[in-house]
Structures are given as structure tokens and as C-alpha cells.
């Protein structure tokens, strides 16, 4: 690859190696996915490694054919009649389809037990689908302090997502029923992971980004399993994963924007050497105000996605330009290496500014304006991912209108054009309160909840908690105690057994 190759096609396979192999590179690239799709894909990533994401729709169609073959003998009889099992699959386990998919025939089931993920929960009905479960794996990799700790959490996740004697009767029966219906299905076993050693260093403990808090929250969610039924626990786990994955993607978008702005400053004459600590604080650490609670957020998410694309396009062009000038460029995988990168720019900015960099960038921005405006491609996919993963599931079926209570975005109104506001559903609140009080032995200040959400880039005013909709929902769920001495007059209570 070369600078000329990049100028011909800046998106497909032409990234500079100093960028492509760095953890700031967003991979896997997110696309459309509902929360059920992310959860089903996580089952496949952690325990069904031999089940390719693209095979799920085909396996679902084959499974459906077997269910509809009422007059044909079953190869292996289950514990219940075929008609009853059909009712379970199509009614009890039914998950809402997107409004534009209502007329399409494919299995859409709630991923309560592992074997459901063999037949349902692919991001696309076609065979060409991305793997949301690998995004969760990537966050575990980035958020853990070492490869050994990442592997330990991955193992704990597999054990918790497995169905064993500690699960309730319904979950054990359901998993056994699916397995008996298709004894030749892919075996459920832990996927072996090759963890990246290049993500960890002395800086890790000093940096603050969503993946770091996510691994702690994931551990807290795993500990909650014994306090509730399987379906309830999957809902809690689902809420934690929804918040973590989207916050991770938006953080990377924000990081790119800040890194590119610092790069522009250096090209314009600002001194590059500010120190790795300052780079960590102002470029890498999460912006605790990415999104505001209760506000309309989709325009902001679009802005983040657009800024990410602009920064990615420009940074890679600059990296290729510096390589053409003979520079040996560091991989952008640490604050120290980012500092070295900025120092190289400072040293060679005269050559960069006198060359074709700025005119080439202007040409690329003009040519790729639809992509940069998120009207197609990567940016559009990021917006779809955030909207459908965080947003409350919409359904044309009245019986499924209340299916999703773990949402983080809710529509203000019934019209198709109604805005999406950042508002937590009841299950999402239970999950977040449990996680922020994971080490608490009793009631704690509501500031812990605000600080916890800020770690994911969500700003919540402490004074608004008691007075607003969030405070009312906390009271309804029995998660607060009135205390005149406490901040805002209320204290948070752990929702589950510690």
C-alpha cells in the first residue's frame, strides 16, 4: 500500500499500519444491531465459535422447517409435543422484529439460553453479517489490566452464560429441549481467545475510558446472576452490554476528533510536546459530557460519527504523507506513542505544509462528502448501531410493546418522526444502580450514580435526580431512601443481594 493507493480509496483496506494496528482503530466496525442481536452474537463469540455469524439465518430457516413438518415424524422426540414447542418458539420466546421487517419470515427469539443463538439473532437476514459479539470481546481486551485478567473474565462470562444446575428450572428445561430437537448442533464450549499483548502498559491504570468501567460492571452483572431468574439476569446483562458497547464506540469517535484537532494545532505552529499525561487527559480519557440525560441525542451522535470519519480520513492521509517523507512512525497505541507522533509532525510540519497534504485532504473531503456526512457507509452504520442498540425496541404487535425495558433511548411521542431522548428504562436503572453500588454494603449518595454514568460519557445533574423523571423512577423501583442529610435528600439502595 502507498499514498497513491490511499488517495484512490481511503476506506477499504488502505489504512496506514501505524493506525490500523492501534487500539484507536474501531474494530469490528459497528453496523445495525438490536440488543438481542448483540447478546446472541456474544453467545456465539464466547461459546459457539464454530457457528459462523452468516450461517445463523440459514440454520434458523432449517429449524423452522422442522417445526412446521407437523405430519412428519421427528428424528428425536422432545419432552413436549411439537405444537407446544411451536408455541414456545413463536410466542413465549418471540422477540420484536423491526417495523420494516414485520412481513419477512425469519425466526426472532429472545436469547435466554445459548442454543437460541444458533437459530436467531443475526444482524442481517442475509449471510453477510458483522459480529457484534467480537465488539464485546474487544472491550474486555481493552478494559482489562492484562491478558491474564481478560482471559479470566472471558471464562467467567462463559460460565455465567452457560446453563447449569444453578439456573432456574425453566432455563434448564428450555436449553435441554432445544438440544434434544437438534442433537447434532454446534457444541457449546468456551472459545479460545488470543489476547493482544500490545494494549497494556504502565499508562493503563491512569487512563479512564468506557471499556475500563465496563469490565467492572460486567463482573458485577455476573455476580448478580444468583439473585434472580435466568430471564431477569439476561435483561440485566443486556443493559450493561448496551451501555458499554455504544459508549465505547462514541468514545472512539470523540478521541479521534480530539486527536485530529491537536494534530491541526501542531501543523499550525503549536508546540507538540505536552507530555503523555496531558495527552491521556485531553485526548484519550472519556469526555464525561458526551451526552446529556433527558436530551435529544441522535443529532449529537451523528456529529460524533461525522467527526470520527473526518479525523480518520485526515490522520491516515497524514501518516501516509509522513511515510513518503521517510519517517518511521510509531503505532498509535499509547499516549507515549501519540506524543512521539505529534513530535514528528512538529519536526516535519514545514515539509507537510509545503507539500500536497492540505490540497489532497481538501480533494478527499470534497469527494467523500456523502460518507463524511453519514449519509452512507461507516458513519450511517455507527448511527444505526447506536440508535438500535440503545433505543427501546419498536413493535407493530401490541403484545410486544413492553418487551424492552432495558433501553437507554426512548421516543418522545408515537409518531415516526418523534425525537429519541436519553432516558433510562426500569431494567437499565436497576442494572446501573447495581453496578455503581457493587462494592457498597449499604445506601450511598446519588452522586455515585451520576459519576458512574459520567464514566460512560453521560452527564446527569445531581440536583435533577430527585426532581426529574429519573428520581421518580428510582422511587418507583424502591431504589432510594429519603435522607435530609444526603445530597439531593436521597440515598441509593443496592437492588440485589451483595
Question: What spans do the regions from the language model cover?
Answer:
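Positively charged, polyanion-binding regions of nucleic-acid-associated proteins
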Residues: 423-443
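Short helix-coil junctions and helix-kink-helix linkers
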Residues: 28, 451-464
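Basic amphipathic alpha-helical segments that dock to polyanions
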Residues: 83, 87-88, 320, 336, ...
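Long, mid-chain structured domain cores
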Residues: 88-273
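Charged, amphipathic alpha-helical stretches
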Residues: 1-123
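Long, internal scaffold/assembly segments composed of regular secondary structure
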Residues: 222-363
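C-terminal engagement modules used by replication, chromatin/transcription, nuclear envelope/ESCRT
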Residues: 470-498
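Long, low-complexity, charged/polar intrinsically disordered regions in eukaryotic proteins
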Residues: 339-424
Amino acid at each position: 500500500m502507498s499514498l497513491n493507493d490511499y488517495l484512490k480509496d481511503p476506506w477499504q483496506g488502505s489504512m496506514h499500519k501505524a493506525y490500523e494496528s492501534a487500539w484507536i482503530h474501531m474494530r469490528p466496525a459497528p453496523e445495525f444491531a438490536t440488543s438481542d442481536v448483540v447478546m446472541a452474537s456474544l453467545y456465539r463469540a464466547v461459546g459457539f465459535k464454530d457457528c459462523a455469524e452468516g450461517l445463523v439465518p440459514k440454520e434458523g430457516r432449517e429449524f423452522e422447517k422442522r417445526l412446521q413438518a407437523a405430519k412428519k415424524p421427528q428424528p428425536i422426540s422432545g419432552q413436549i409435543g411439537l405444537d407446544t414447542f411451536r408455541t414456545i418458539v413463536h410466542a413465549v420466546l418471540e422477540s420484536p422484529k423491526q417495523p420494516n421487517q414485520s412481513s419477512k419470515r425469519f425466526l426472532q427469539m429472545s436469547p435466554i439460553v445459548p442454543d437460541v443463538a444458533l437459530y436467531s439473532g443475526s444482524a442481517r437476514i442475509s449471510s453477510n453479517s458483522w459480529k457484534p459479539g467480537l465488539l464485546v470481546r474487544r472491550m474486555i481486551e481493552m478494559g482489562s489490566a492484562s491478558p491474564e485478567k481478560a482471559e479470566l473474565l472471558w471464562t467467567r462470562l462463559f460460565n455465567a452464560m452457560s446453563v447449569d444446575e444453578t439456573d432456574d428450572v425453566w432455563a434448564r428445561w428450555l436449553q435441554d429441549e432445544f438440544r434434544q430437537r437438534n442433537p447434532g448442533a454446534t457444541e457449546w464450549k468456551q472459545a479460545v481467545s488470543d489476547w493482544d499483548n500490545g494494549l497494556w502498559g504502565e499508562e493503563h491504570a491512569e487512563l479512564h475510558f468506557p471499556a475500563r468501567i465496563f469490565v467492572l460492571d460486567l463482573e458485577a452483572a455476573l455476580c448478580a446472576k444468583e439473585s434472580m431468574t435466568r430471564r431477569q439476569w439476561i435483561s440485566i446483562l443486556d443493559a450493561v452490554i448496551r451501555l458499554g458497547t455504544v459508549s465505547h464506540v462514541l468514545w472512539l469517535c470523540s478521541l479521534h476528533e480530539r486527536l485530529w484537532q491537536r494534530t491541526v494545532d501542531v501543523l499550525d505552529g503549536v508546540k507538540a510536546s505536552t507530555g503523555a499525561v496531558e495527552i491521556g487527559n485531553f485526548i484519550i480519557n472519556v469526555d464525561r459530557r458526551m451526552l446529556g440525560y433527558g436530551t435529544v441525542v441522535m443529532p449529537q451522535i451523528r456529529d460524533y460519527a461525522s467527526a470520527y470519519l473526518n479525523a480518520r480520513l485526515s490522520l491516515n492521509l497524514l501518516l501516509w504523507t509522513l511515510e513518503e517523507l521517510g519517517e518511521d512512525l510509531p503505532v498509535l497505541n499509547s499516549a507515549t506513542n501519540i506524543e512521539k507522533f505529534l513530535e514528528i509532525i512538529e519536526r516535519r510540519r514545514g515539509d507537510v505544509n509545503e507539500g500536497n497534504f492540505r490540497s489532497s485532504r481538501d480533494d478527499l473531503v470534497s469527494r467523500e462528502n456523502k460518507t463524511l456526512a453519514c449519509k452512507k457507509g461507516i458513519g450511517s452504520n455507527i448511527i444505526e448501531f447506536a440508535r438500535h442498540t440503545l433505543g427501546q425496541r419498536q413493535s407493530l404487535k401490541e403484545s410486544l410493546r413492553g418487551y424492552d425495558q432495558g433501553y437507554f433511548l426512548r421516543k418522545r411521542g408515537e409518531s415516526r418522526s418523534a425525537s429519541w431522548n436519553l432516558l433510562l428504562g426500569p431494567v437499565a436503572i436497576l442494572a446501573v444502580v447495581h453496578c455503581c453500588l457493587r462494592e457498597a454494603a449499604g445506601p450511598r449518595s446519588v452522586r455515585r450514580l451520576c459519576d458512574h454514568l459520567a464514566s460512560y460519557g453521560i452527564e446527569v445533574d445531581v440536583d435533577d435526580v430527585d426532581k426529574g423523571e429519573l428520581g421518580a423512577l428510582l422511587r418507583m423501583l424502591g431504589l432510594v431512601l429519603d435522607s435530609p442529610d444526603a445530597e439531593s435528600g436521597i440515598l441509593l439502595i443496592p437492588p440485589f443481594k451483595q
